[in-house]
């Protein structure tokens, strides 16, 4: 049975592409706020019927199907030398807390 995966901050599908190459994974949903990235993601993969949200802060955990694994490459520019290093003063710097909120609500196996 494939491991069910929720792909947060999915961008253009790096995690999904790797998982597809490895095999044994089934994606139940994805989330990203970049329309261009989502368009590319949906061009590469059949996502009809998957859970989708374009804002991690708006994810309603009651609407997400159960999953085994959450993956997510949350934005790091708030902490990076490539950014202004505003850390938690930058709204992007708090997005990883959304992963924690989802994990606490859903209790996936991994």
Segments from the language model and where they lie:
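Conserved active-site and SAM-binding loop architecture
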Residues: 1-110
């Amino acid at each position: 049975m494939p491991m069910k995966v929720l792909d947060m901050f999915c961008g253009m599908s790096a995690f999904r592409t790797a998982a597809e190459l490895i095999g044994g994974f089934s994606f139940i949903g994805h989330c990203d706020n970049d329309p261009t990235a989502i368009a590319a993601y949906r061009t590469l993969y059949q996502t009809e019927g998957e859970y989708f949200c374009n804002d991690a802060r708006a994810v309603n955990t009651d609407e997400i199907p159960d999953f085994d694994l959450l993956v997510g490459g949350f934005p790091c520019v708030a902490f990076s030398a490539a950014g202004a290093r505003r850390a938690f003063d930058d709204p992007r710097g708090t997005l990883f807390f959304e992963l924690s909120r989802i994990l606490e609500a859903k209790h996936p196996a991994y």
